[in-house]
Protein backbone atom coordinates (compact mmCIF):
# COMPACT_ATOMS: atom_id res chain seq x y z
CA UNK A 1 0.00 0.00 0.00
CA UNK A 2 1.31 3.46 -0.88
CA UNK A 3 1.89 6.05 1.84
CA UNK A 4 0.04 9.34 2.09
CA UNK A 5 1.60 12.28 0.26
CA UNK A 6 2.34 15.81 1.41
CA UNK A 7 0.68 18.57 -0.66
CA UNK A 8 3.94 19.34 -2.49
CA UNK A 9 4.62 15.67 -3.20
CA UNK A 10 1.08 15.33 -4.56
CA UNK A 11 1.64 18.37 -6.80
CA UNK A 12 4.84 16.86 -8.21
CA UNK A 13 3.13 13.52 -8.85
CA UNK A 14 0.11 15.15 -10.50
CA UNK A 15 2.34 17.20 -12.83
CA UNK A 16 4.23 14.06 -13.88
CA UNK A 17 0.92 12.30 -14.61
CA UNK A 18 -0.35 15.33 -16.53
CA UNK A 19 2.81 15.49 -18.65
CA UNK A 20 2.63 11.79 -19.53
CA UNK A 21 -1.09 12.07 -20.28
CA UNK A 22 -0.77 15.16 -22.51
CA UNK A 23 2.66 14.70 -24.12
CA UNK A 24 3.29 10.99 -23.82
CA UNK A 25 6.52 11.31 -21.83
CA UNK A 26 7.58 12.52 -18.37
CA UNK A 27 8.70 16.09 -17.63
CA UNK A 28 12.31 17.05 -17.01
CA UNK A 29 13.58 17.90 -13.53
CA UNK A 30 13.68 21.58 -14.51
CA UNK A 31 10.09 21.49 -15.78
CA UNK A 32 8.93 19.92 -12.52
CA UNK A 33 10.72 22.61 -10.52
CA UNK A 34 9.21 25.41 -12.59
CA UNK A 35 5.70 23.97 -12.28
CA UNK A 36 5.63 23.43 -8.51
CA UNK A 37 7.94 26.25 -7.41
CA UNK A 38 11.15 24.37 -6.59
CA UNK A 39 14.22 26.34 -7.63
CA UNK A 40 16.83 23.66 -6.92
CA UNK A 41 17.18 20.54 -9.05
CA UNK A 42 18.51 18.69 -6.01
CA UNK A 43 15.26 19.52 -4.18
CA UNK A 44 13.24 18.12 -7.10
CA UNK A 45 15.35 14.96 -7.02
CA UNK A 46 14.59 14.74 -3.30
CA UNK A 47 10.84 14.81 -3.98
CA UNK A 48 11.20 12.20 -6.71
CA UNK A 49 13.15 9.97 -4.33
CA UNK A 50 10.41 10.31 -1.70
CA UNK A 51 7.72 9.46 -4.26
CA UNK A 52 9.74 6.42 -5.27
CA UNK A 53 10.22 5.33 -1.64
CA UNK A 54 6.47 5.70 -1.03
CA UNK A 55 5.67 3.48 -4.01
CA UNK A 56 4.26 6.06 -6.42
CA UNK A 57 7.13 6.13 -8.93
CA UNK A 58 9.81 3.91 -10.37
CA UNK A 59 12.92 5.64 -11.73
CA UNK A 60 16.13 4.79 -13.55
CA UNK A 61 18.63 7.35 -12.26
CA UNK A 62 21.02 6.65 -15.15
CA UNK A 63 18.56 7.86 -17.79
CA UNK A 64 16.93 11.28 -18.19
CA UNK A 65 13.13 11.44 -17.83
CA UNK A 66 12.99 7.69 -17.07
CA UNK A 67 10.03 7.93 -14.69
CA UNK A 68 7.24 5.34 -14.49
CA UNK A 69 4.09 6.20 -12.54
CA UNK A 70 2.99 3.23 -10.44
CA UNK A 71 -0.10 4.94 -9.00
CA UNK A 72 -2.20 4.72 -12.15
CA UNK A 73 -5.95 4.99 -11.44
CA UNK A 74 -6.83 3.76 -14.91
CA UNK A 75 -4.83 0.60 -14.29
CA UNK A 76 -2.84 1.14 -17.46
CA UNK A 77 0.90 0.68 -17.63
CA UNK A 78 2.68 2.96 -20.07
CA UNK A 79 5.57 1.13 -21.72
CA UNK A 80 8.58 3.20 -22.82
CA UNK A 81 11.54 2.58 -25.10
CA UNK A 82 14.83 4.46 -24.83
CA UNK A 83 15.56 6.17 -28.16
CA UNK A 84 19.16 7.25 -28.84
CA UNK A 85 19.74 10.88 -29.79
CA UNK A 86 22.40 10.89 -32.53
CA UNK A 87 23.43 14.50 -33.05
CA UNK A 88 22.01 16.92 -35.58
CA UNK A 89 20.56 16.91 -39.08
CA UNK A 90 20.09 19.81 -41.45
CA UNK A 91 16.70 20.97 -42.68
CA UNK A 92 18.46 23.40 -44.98
CA UNK A 93 21.83 22.81 -46.59
CA UNK A 94 22.87 19.16 -46.03
CA UNK A 95 24.84 18.73 -42.83
CA UNK A 96 26.90 15.80 -41.64
CA UNK A 97 24.87 13.76 -39.13
CA UNK A 98 27.30 12.43 -36.59
CA UNK A 99 26.39 8.85 -35.72
CA UNK A 100 27.37 9.17 -32.09
CA UNK A 101 24.98 8.84 -29.21
CA UNK A 102 24.56 12.18 -27.46
CA UNK A 103 21.68 11.26 -25.19
CA UNK A 104 18.80 8.89 -24.54
CA UNK A 105 15.17 10.01 -24.75
CA UNK A 106 12.36 7.73 -23.49
CA UNK A 107 9.24 7.62 -25.66
CA UNK A 108 6.03 5.64 -25.12
CA UNK A 109 5.65 2.58 -27.33
CA UNK A 110 2.14 3.66 -28.32
CA UNK A 111 3.75 6.78 -29.86
CA UNK A 112 6.54 5.04 -31.80
CA UNK A 113 5.03 1.71 -32.71
CA UNK A 114 7.37 -1.18 -33.51
CA UNK A 115 10.81 -0.89 -35.07
CA UNK A 116 14.23 0.58 -34.36
CA UNK A 117 14.38 4.34 -33.80
CA UNK A 118 16.74 7.24 -33.36
CA UNK A 119 16.32 10.98 -32.88
CA UNK A 120 18.12 13.94 -34.45
CA UNK A 121 18.01 17.64 -33.65
CA UNK A 122 16.99 19.70 -36.68
CA UNK A 123 19.02 22.71 -37.74
CA UNK A 124 17.59 24.99 -40.43
CA UNK A 125 14.20 26.07 -41.73
CA UNK A 126 13.67 24.20 -45.00
CA UNK A 127 10.86 22.06 -43.50
CA UNK A 128 8.92 24.80 -41.72
CA UNK A 129 5.83 24.40 -43.92
CA UNK A 130 5.62 20.76 -42.77
CA UNK A 131 5.70 21.97 -39.16
CA UNK A 132 9.32 20.93 -38.56
CA UNK A 133 11.15 23.87 -37.02
CA UNK A 134 14.74 24.69 -36.19
CA UNK A 135 15.61 23.01 -32.88
CA UNK A 136 12.94 20.29 -33.11
CA UNK A 137 13.98 16.71 -32.43
CA UNK A 138 12.70 14.39 -35.16
CA UNK A 139 11.87 10.79 -34.30
CA UNK A 140 13.08 8.51 -37.09
CA UNK A 141 12.28 4.86 -37.76
CA UNK A 142 15.32 3.17 -39.26
CA UNK A 143 14.47 1.89 -42.75
CA UNK A 144 16.26 1.82 -46.09
CA UNK A 145 13.34 2.77 -48.30
CA UNK A 146 10.31 5.05 -48.17
CA UNK A 147 7.34 5.96 -50.29
CA UNK A 148 6.79 9.04 -52.44
CA UNK A 149 5.96 12.01 -50.26
CA UNK A 150 7.40 10.54 -47.06
CA UNK A 151 9.59 12.80 -44.92
CA UNK A 152 12.95 11.08 -44.59
CA UNK A 153 16.45 11.50 -43.28
CA UNK A 154 18.60 10.92 -46.36
CA UNK A 155 22.36 10.56 -46.71
CA UNK A 156 23.69 12.36 -49.75
CA UNK A 157 27.47 12.30 -50.36
CA UNK A 158 28.07 11.46 -46.68
CA UNK A 159 25.86 14.31 -45.49
CA UNK A 160 22.41 13.92 -43.98
CA UNK A 161 19.36 16.08 -44.52
CA UNK A 162 15.64 15.87 -43.71
CA UNK A 163 13.41 16.37 -46.74
CA UNK A 164 10.31 15.00 -48.45
CA UNK A 165 11.23 12.15 -50.80
CA UNK A 166 10.05 11.80 -54.40
CA UNK A 167 11.20 9.21 -56.96
CA UNK A 168 10.71 10.49 -60.49
CA UNK A 169 12.15 9.94 -63.98
CA UNK A 170 15.06 7.82 -62.82
CA UNK A 171 16.21 10.25 -60.17
CA UNK A 172 15.50 11.26 -56.59
CA UNK A 173 14.04 14.62 -55.61
CA UNK A 174 14.52 15.74 -52.01
CA UNK A 175 11.91 18.44 -51.65
CA UNK A 176 12.06 21.10 -48.93
CA UNK A 177 8.84 22.32 -47.33
CA UNK A 178 9.82 25.96 -47.72
CA UNK A 179 8.76 27.75 -50.88
CA UNK A 180 11.90 29.90 -50.74
CA UNK A 181 14.23 26.90 -51.09
CA UNK A 182 15.08 24.72 -54.08
CA UNK A 183 14.84 20.91 -54.19
CA UNK A 184 17.91 18.68 -54.24
CA UNK A 185 18.19 16.24 -57.16
CA UNK A 186 20.35 13.12 -57.15
CA UNK A 187 20.68 9.88 -59.10
CA UNK A 188 20.50 7.98 -55.82
CA UNK A 189 20.54 8.64 -52.09
CA UNK A 190 20.80 6.45 -49.02
CA UNK A 191 17.69 6.52 -46.86
CA UNK A 192 18.55 6.40 -43.16
CA UNK A 193 14.95 6.36 -42.00
CA UNK A 194 11.46 7.80 -42.12
CA UNK A 195 10.42 10.66 -39.84
CA UNK A 196 7.43 9.51 -37.78
CA UNK A 197 7.15 12.33 -35.27
CA UNK A 198 8.91 15.11 -33.45
CA UNK A 199 9.51 16.49 -29.99
CA UNK A 200 9.52 20.25 -29.48
CA UNK A 201 10.61 22.24 -26.48
CA UNK A 202 8.27 25.12 -25.64
CA UNK A 203 10.19 28.08 -24.23
From Swiss-Prot:
Annotated site, Cleavage, chain positions: 91-92
Gene Ontology terms describing biological process: DNA repair; DNA replication; negative regulation of DNA-templated transcription; proteolysis; SOS response
Q: Which reaction does it catalyse?
A: Hydrolysis of Ala-|-Gly bond in repressor LexA
Q: Which UniProt keywords apply?
A: Autocatalytic cleavage, DNA damage, DNA repair, DNA replication, DNA-binding, Hydrolase, Repressor, SOS response, Transcription, Transcription regulation
What Pfam families does this protein map onto?
Answer: LexA_DNA_bind (PF01726), Peptidase_S24 (PF00717)
**DNA-binding region at which residues?**
29-49
Q: Do you know which InterPro entries this protein is assigned to? A: LexA (IPR006200), LexA-like (IPR039418), LexA/Signal_pep-like_sf (IPR036286), LexA_DNA-bd_dom (IPR006199), LexA_repressor (IPR050077), Peptidase_S24_LexA (IPR006197), Peptidase_S24_S26A/B/C (IPR015927), WH-like_DNA-bd_sf (IPR036388)
Q: Which residues form the active site?
A: 126, 163
Q: MF terms per GO, please?
A: DNA binding; serine-type endopeptidase activity
Stated EC number for the protein is 3.4.21.88
Q: What class of enzyme is it?
A: hydrolase
Cite the record's note on assembly. Answer: Homodimer.
Task: Describe the task this protein carries out.
Answer: Represses a number of genes involved in the response to DNA damage (SOS response), including recA and lexA. In the presence of single-stranded DNA, RecA interacts with LexA causing an autocatalytic cleavage which disrupts the DNA-binding part of LexA, leading to derepression of the SOS regulon and eventually DNA repair.
Q: Which NCBIfam families match?
A: lexA (TIGR00498)
The UniProt entry's sequence similarity note says:
Belongs to the peptidase S24 family.
Q: Which PANTHER family does the UniProt entry name for this protein?
A: LEXA REPRESSOR, LEXA REPRESSOR-RELATED
The protein's name is: LexA repressor
Amino acid sequence: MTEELTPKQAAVLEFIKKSIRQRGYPPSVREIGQEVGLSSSSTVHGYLKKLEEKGYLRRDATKPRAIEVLDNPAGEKVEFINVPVLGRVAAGVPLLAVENREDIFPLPVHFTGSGEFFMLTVRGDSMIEAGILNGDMVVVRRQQDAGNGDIVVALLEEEATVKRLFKENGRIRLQPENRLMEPIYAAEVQILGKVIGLVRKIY
